[in-house]
Each structure stands twice: as structure tokens, then as C-alpha cells.
């Protein structure tokens, strides 16, 4: 990375200056950032401002001394200019040849170009999807899956040791409701008339589960008390649904390294051990929740059970989360002594933290209020809040013909993720889920996703990759060998459009590293769209001006072909990070072979 070269030169200069006694040894790190205005150079460095207080010198005066040291360190001539600006920033301009050599690096590193070591092998568990095993995955789950998979992919490219994890909620009330729904369908298959309660699961898959149980057990549980069949029906239903979920995930090419079970946390004694740990650390006590707030002018609100049946009137075992920044203390045990869902959840995070250096949770935006209590739990358990990062996923509106398609798992009319993938394809599904920030709502236009036109974002990027492949096909047909890097030839890449493409290629590793550290895979999709737009513009302009990639000048042709080679590699790598294919052949938007369009 060109940025790495700037960092290397400044570190060398600062170390030499410290050895010579010109300033103290550098303590805190300095930043090297691209300025907002390109007129200010390629990078801005704040080393003088960071070191000024320690050195006891004005920042601008120190900056001048650092500039002289950096110039002395730059024996290869990689820097074209160093200027002092503002309170003491050092603006850096790189030599044209240094930029050009990034093309050679992109081609030499091939499918590994863009990988960095910023993660230093740090172990990270990325937990995503974790949809309740009560039905097939809908489109909202799909966005969580694709964003989570994008996050873990970015972290791998940045040098982290990543474990992909799915947490199966196979213990609570919802899976019991599923089991009871299956039993009703089981009765129905034996000829009885049943009425499905409002909170049951009426989907066709419930009938399939019931049919499997009927085939295996006959009428054995038709009139049996619930205690005899509930656990069996629950476990059978959960395994059936998990099989469906695995299939849905496979349709978008997502798999996991570990499937963790809530039920297993209880059966292994992890939850009980965790509660004892909380008691030993004096992190819990018996008390009542604050009474519910009443509206102004209204009588005091009466305590109502929450989703776990807990009310403010009961004596509960409360976790001291308010001491760590949460709004109130949270119940970890109900009045009857059974653990709450929150208890199992923080026990799970306790378990994860013992297996990794950092945790990433990818959650629906409706869990936003849940984040502070998780952060409080992490801090109370002796970890840092920074060891947990939560990525929130906003809603998806599935659009068809300008109208929203509703999703309702309980009504049995959901539009499943599998249906969308079958209709628009894996690549379109994955890419479109990443065309907006995850914390912003997304309209998924099914008709647009199927369209083979340049207004379809995934088609637009893939078409650019295929166009580059077609350029090389045409070059071979014209007798041009795919060139190796030639610095003299590369110096002919002098147009503003060519220089822009070179800088975009050079920026690719830094972009990936920054996206990984921000947990934002949409940045890669944005980069690809912007970069391919710059390529299409350059290519079209060249055809109009007579400066085609394959032209009469063999030196310029060789340079432009090498630029295209590096760009094609970057596009392929960027698409690979997102789990999207990079085809070499496609039909053009006018339904002719793309080779006719170069």
C-alpha cells in the first residue's frame, strides 16, 4: 500500500531524529490520512502535532525539522513533495512512479491483493443470523445473513482469525409454541378438526414436520398429555427447521464454523455455573424492578408481565447492570427461580469471550435497546466494552411492481429468502443487500434485481469485469500478448482518468482494512460501483477520442492493457470479499455478446 510507504518513511525519520537527539522518541502513533481536498496532496500526516508537546517545540517548527528528516530517509525518491500546512500538518505528495508500481503489486499479488495484517491474528467470533428455529428464513433474515457474512469476510481479509457462529434459540417459549403447532397438525393428520390459535405457526412446513412424526410414531401421542410429547416434538421440529435454514443459507453461499445451542447451555450446566459466578462476584441481588412509569395525569400504571412473564411486583434476582451504564438492573432469575433469556444470553457471551479476543453481534435494529445491557454485562464480567461490537440491521421492504410485499411468518404468507434467491439469483441477492448501510432501511426491488441492464447495480459491476475480460480476448485476437509491468510504458498513463483509476487501485487495500475495522461491508459495494463507473467513463471516452485501450501505439496499448489487468484483479477480489461471482462472459445490456462492445 502506498500509505504504508508513507508510514514507513515517517517512522524511519522519527526514529533517526530521536537517535540523534533532535526530538524525544515518538510515543503515541501519528495518523496518515487522505485529505478531503486532493489539492492538499495525497496524504496528510500529523506527526509534528502529536510530538510537539513532548518535544517542547511549536508544531510548525517541529514539522519543518521532520520534513528534512523524511527527505533524507527517502533515498528511493518515492515522495514528490512535502509541505507544511495549518497548525503543523505535513502534506505529502507521492511520486508518479510510486503510484504506477501499485499496478505491478496488484497483478503480482493476484487474488491476495487487498489482504492486510491489521488484525494481527486476533481471534474474533462473528455471530450472525441466529434466526429462531421456528420457520424458514425471510428476507429480513437474509439481509442479516449477507451483512454478517460480509463482515466476517472483511475481517478475514484484514488478518483476523474469525469464527462464524450461529446461536440457536432452541429452549424458550417460541420453540414450545412451534411444538404445540406441530401437535395440532399431527392431530389434523389423524382426521381431527383443529383450530390454530393466533400465536401458532400455520406454515406448510409445520404440516411436513407433523407428517414425519406421524410416520415415525403413528397415533402414539394423539391423546397423550403434553408432558409426554412436548420435548420430543420440540426437538424434532427444531432439527427440521434448522435443516431448512441451512438450505436457505446455502442458497446464498453462507455456512458457519459453529452452531451454538441455547438448550445446550442449560444441559451442560453453563447457565448454572454462570449464575454462581455472578453471585461470587456480588454482581446480583434479590430485589424488585422499578414500577412502570405512568403518563402525566393518569393513575399509577399497574405492573404488567413482560415477554418472559416477569413483573415489577415480584422479587427477582437482578444483575447490577446499572452500575455499568445500563438504565436499570436486569433480571437474570424469575421469582420461581428459572433463569431469564437475558441470563442465558449473557452466559453465552461469557462463553464466547473465553474463546475469543473480541465479539461481533449482528442484530436486528429492533434489538438496539438491548445493546447497552450487553455492553454493561461485558464490562461487569471483566472485559472491555470495546471487546463487543454490535452491527444493527434495519428493515427490508421487498418491492414488486412498485408495491411492498408483506412478510409474516406467523400468518404463513411470508416471502422466504429462498424464493427471492430462486427468482433473482444468488449474486443479485447478496450484492443488493449491501448497497446501503446496514443501519438504514432497504427497499429490495425484485424486478430491478432481475433486470440485465446497467441500472441493476450487480449487473453493472459484473458487466465491467466481463468487459475487461473481453478486452483481453480482443487483444489476443489482435496479436497483443498480455503484458508484464513496464515502468517506462506505464508512464504514458497520464490522462486524469487513468491517474484516477490508478489511485483507486492503490486505495483498494486501505479501503478493505478501513471497512473491516468499521464492520461496514457496504463500503466495498460502494467502492466497486464507483470504480467501475470510472472505468466505463474512461473506456467510453477513449473510444470517442480515438484513445482506445487497443490502439495504434504499441507502448500505450501495453500500458493500458496492464492497467486493465490490475483493475480486473481488483474487481474480482472486491466481488470475492462480498461473495459475488466475477464472470468473464455476459450479454451486454443490448443483448449482444459483450465482445462486440469493446
Curated annotation (Swiss-Prot):
Its EC number is 6.1.1.19. Residues 288-308 are annotated as: Disordered. CDD domains: ArgRS_core (cd00671). Transmembrane segments: none annotated. Keywords: Aminoacyl-tRNA synthetase, ATP-binding, Cytoplasm, Ligase, Nucleotide-binding, Protein biosynthesis. Its main location: cytoplasm. Gene3D superfamilies: Arginyl tRNA synthetase N-terminal domain, HUPs, Isoleucyl-tRNA Synthetase, Domain 1. One of its GO terms (molecular function) is ATP binding. It is found in: Cytoplasm. It comes from the Bacteria. GO terms for cellular component: cytoplasm. Pfam families: Arg_tRNA_synt_N (PF03485), DALR_1 (PF05746), tRNA-synt_1d (PF00750). InterPro entries: aa-tRNA-synth_I_CS, Arg-tRNA-ligase, Arg-tRNA-synth_N, Arg-tRNA-synth_N_sf, ArgRS_core, DALR_anticod-bd, Rossmann-like_a/b/a_fold, tRNAsynth_Ia_anticodon-bd. A motif ('HIGH' region) lies at residues 131-141. It is an enzyme of class 6 (ligase). GO terms for biological process: arginyl-tRNA aminoacylation. It catalyses: tRNA(Arg) + L-arginine + ATP = L-arginyl-tRNA(Arg) + AMP + diphosphate. Monomer. Belongs to the class-I aminoacyl-tRNA synthetase family. This is Arginine--tRNA ligase. It comes from Anaeromyxobacter sp. (strain K). The lineage of its organism: Bacteria, Pseudomonadati, Myxococcota, Myxococcia, Myxococcales.
Amino acid at each position: 500500500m502506498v500509505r504504508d510507504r508513507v508510514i514507513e518513511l515517517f517512522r524511519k525519520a522519527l526514529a533517526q531524529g530521536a537517535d540523534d537527539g533532535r526530538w524525544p522518541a515518538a510515543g503515541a502513533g501519528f495518523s496518515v490520512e487522505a485529505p478531503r481536498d486532493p489539492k492538499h496532496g495525497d496524504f496528510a500526516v500529523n506527526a509534528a502535532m502529536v510530538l510537539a508537546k513532548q518535544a517542547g517545540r511549536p508544531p510548525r517548527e517541529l514539522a519543518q525539522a521532520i520534513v528534512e528528516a523524511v527527505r533524507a530517509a527517502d533515498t528511493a525518491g518515492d515522495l514528490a513533495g512535502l509541505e507544511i500546512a495549518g497548525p503543523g500538518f505535513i502534506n505529502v505528495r507521492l511520486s508518479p512512479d510510486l503510484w504506477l508500481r501499485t499496478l505491478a503489486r496488484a497483478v503480482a499479488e493476484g487474488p491476495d491483493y487487498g489482504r492486510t495484517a491489521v488484525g494481527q491474528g486476533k481471534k474474533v467470533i462473528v455471530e450472525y443470523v441466529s434466526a429462531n428455529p421456528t420457520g424458514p428464513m425471510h428476507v429480513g433474515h437474509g439481509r442479516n445473513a449477507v451483512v454478517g457474512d460480509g463482515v466476517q469476510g472483511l475481517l478475514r481479509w484484514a488478518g483476523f482469525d474469525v469464527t462464524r457462529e450461529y446461536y440457536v434459540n432452541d429452549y424458550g417459549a417460541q420453540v414450545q409454541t412451534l411444538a404445540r403447532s406441530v401437535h395440532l397438525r399431527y392431530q389434523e393428520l389423524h382426521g381431527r378438526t383443529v383450530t390454530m390459535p393466533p400465536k401458532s405457526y400455520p406454515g406448510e412446513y409445520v404440516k411436513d414436520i407433523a407428517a414425519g412424526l406421524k410416520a415415525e410414531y403413528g397415533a402414539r401421542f394423539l391423546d397423550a398429555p403434553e408432558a409426554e410429547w412436548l420435548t420430543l416434538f420440540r426437538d424434532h421440529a427444531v432439527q427440521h427447521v434448522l435443516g431448512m435454514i441451512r438450505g436457505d443459507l446455502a442458497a446464498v453461499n453462507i455456512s458457519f464454523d459453529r452452531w451454538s445451542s441455547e438448550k445446550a447451555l442449560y444441559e451442560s450446566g453453563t447457565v448454572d455455573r454462570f449464575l454462581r459466578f455472578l453471585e461470587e462476584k456480588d454482581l446480583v441481588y434479590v430485589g424488585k424492578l422499578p414500577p412502570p412509569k405512568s403518563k402525566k395525569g393518569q393513575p399509577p400504571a399497574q405492573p404488567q408481565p413482560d415477554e418472559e412473564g416477569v413483573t415489577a411486583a415480584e422479587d427477582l434476582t437482578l444483575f447490577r447492570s446499572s452500575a455499568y451504564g445500563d438504565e436499570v438492573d436486569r433480571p437474570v432469575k424469575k421469582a420461581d427461580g428459572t433463569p431469564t433469556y437475558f441470563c442465558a444470553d449473557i452466559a453465552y457471551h461469557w462463553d464466547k469471550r473465553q474463546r475469543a479476543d473480541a465479539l461481533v453481534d449482528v442484530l436486528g435494529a429492533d434489538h438496539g435497546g438491548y445493546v447497552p445491557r450487553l455492553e454493561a454485562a461485558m464490562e461487569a464480567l471483566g472485559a472491555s466494552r470495546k471487546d463487543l461490537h454490535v452491527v444493527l440491521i434495519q428493515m427490508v421492504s421487498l418491492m414488486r411492481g412498485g408495491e411492498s410485499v408483506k412478510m409474516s411468518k406467523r400468518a404463513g404468507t411470508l416471502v422466504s429468502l429462498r424464493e427471492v434467491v430462486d427468482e433473482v439469483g444468488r449474486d443479485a441477492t447478496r450484492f443488493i443487500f449491501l448497497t446501503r448501510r446496514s443501519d438504514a432501511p432497504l427497499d429490495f426491488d425484485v424486478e430491478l434485481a432481475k433486470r440485465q441492464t446497467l441500472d441493476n447495480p450487480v449487473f453493472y459491476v459484473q458487466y465491467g469485469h466481463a468487459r475487461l475480460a473481453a478486452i483481453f480476448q480482443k487483444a489476443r485476437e489482435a496479436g497483443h500478448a498480455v503484458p508484464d509491468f513496464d515502468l517506462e510504458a506505464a508512464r504514458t498513463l497520464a490522462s486524469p482518468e487513468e491517474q484516477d483509476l490508478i489511485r483507486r487501485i492503490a486505495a483498494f487495500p486501505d479501503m478493505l482494512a478501513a471497512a473491516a475495522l468499521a464492520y461496514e461491508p457496504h463500503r466495498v459495494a460502494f467502492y466497486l460501483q464507483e470504480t467501475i463507473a470510472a472505468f466505463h467513463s474512461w473506456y467510453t471516452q477513449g473510444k470517442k477520442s480515438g484513445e482506445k485501450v487497443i490502439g495504434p501505439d504499441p507502448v500505450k496499448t501495453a500500458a493500458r492493457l496492464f492497467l486493465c489487468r490490475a483493475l480486473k484483479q481488483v474487481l474480482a477480489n472486491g466481488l470475492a470479499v462480498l461473495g459475488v461471482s466475477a464472470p468473464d462472459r455476459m450479454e451486454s445490456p443490448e443483448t449482444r455478446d459483450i465482445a462486440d462492445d469493446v
